[in-house]
């Protein structure tokens, strides 16, 4: 299977997000890379599902709370940017303060 660098990045994000999802389901608090992967993958899937950019941006702030992550992680993630594929093309989505 031949994948472009972008496709490889998407698979890496998905794999890290899957691990984060499983750890969260077991009651573990997510660390920085897990939290970023979890939110990023959810944003990409929401875009793929046909939500608008504004809906995806708002959705990104509802995925995790301070109780879901290790101490200090929310401050380490002032914003998340991801190029997501929407039905009308690829767009850059920025979520400010994704963990309120």
UniProtKB/Swiss-Prot annotation:
This is Urease subunit gamma. Pfam families: Urease_gamma. The keyword Nucleus does not apply. GO terms for biological process: urea catabolic process. Its EC number is 3.5.1.5. Pathway: Nitrogen metabolism; urea degradation; CO(2) and NH(3) from urea (urease route): step 1/1. It comes from Burkholderia multivorans (strain ATCC 17616 / 249). Transmembrane segments: none annotated. One of its GO terms (molecular function) is nickel cation binding. It comes from the Bacteria. It catalyses: urea + 2 H2O + H(+) = hydrogencarbonate + 2 NH4(+). The gene is ureA. Heterotrimer of UreA (gamma), UreB (beta) and UreC (alpha) subunits. Three heterotrimers associate to form the active enzyme.
């Amino acid at each position: 299977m031949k994948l472009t660098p972008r496709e490889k990045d998407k698979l890496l994000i998905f794999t890290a997000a899957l691990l984060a999802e499983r750890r969260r389901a077991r009651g573990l608090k997510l660390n920085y890379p897990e939290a970023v992967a979890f939110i990023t993958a959810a944003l990409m899937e929401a875009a793929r599902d046909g939500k608008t950019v504004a809906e995806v941006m708002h959705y990104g702030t509802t995925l995790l709370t301070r109780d879901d992550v290790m101490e200090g992680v929310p401050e380490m993630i002032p914003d998340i940017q991801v190029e997501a594929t929407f039905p009308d093309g690829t767009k850059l989505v920025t979520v400010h303060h994704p963990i309120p």
